[in-house]
Amino acid sequence: QRPEYPVWREKGAV
């Protein structure tokens, strides 16, 4: 599964 937007970015793990 590959989301269009970076989910790891939403978690704040950038």
Swiss-Prot record:
Keyword list, A-Z: Hydrolase, Protease, Pyrrolidone carboxylic acid, Thiol protease
Top-rank taxon: Eukaryota
Signal peptide (UniProt feature, chain positions): none
Disulfide bonds: none
GO biological process, one term: proteolysis
GO molecular function, one term: cysteine-type peptidase activity
Chain positions with Pyrrolidone carboxylic acid modification: Q1
Record carries keyword Transferase: no
EC number: 3.4.22.-
Family recorded in the similarity comment: Belongs to the peptidase C1 family.
Protein name: Calotropin-DI
The organism of origin for this protein: Calotropis gigantea
